[in-house]
Amino acid sequence: MAKKISSEASVDQQMKKIGEKVRELRRQMNQNYEAWSYLNGINKVSLNRIERGENVTMKMLLEILKKLDVSVQDFFNGIR
């Protein structure tokens, strides 16, 4: 059974981990956020916010994962 998130702090921690993982995957492509966002048609301000663990829509996250060529399952597999 999956663990439940027990507090707002935990949600914030999870958001930061999601952002860190997006940043890690982008950096593995040897791209800074400005170049990567331009090449993939993603607003650089939005990408920067996501990478900092700020609010992100599911639609935006799915678009980014598609551009990174990463499945949702693989992306969340390492996030605890």
Which residues make up each language-model segment?
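Short, basic-rich loop-to-helix N-cap that marks the start of a DNA-contacting helix
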Residues: 53-66
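Helix-turn-helix DNA-binding elements, focusing on the entry/boundary residues of the two helices
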Residues: 22, 33, 44, 58-61, ...
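Residues in the recognition helix of alpha-helical DNA-binding motifs
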Residues: 25, 39, 50, 78
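The alpha-helix within a helix-turn-helix
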Residues: 26, 37, 65
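A short, Lys/Arg-rich alpha-helix, primarily the initiator
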Residues: 2-28
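Short alpha-helical DNA-recognition segment
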Residues: 29-48
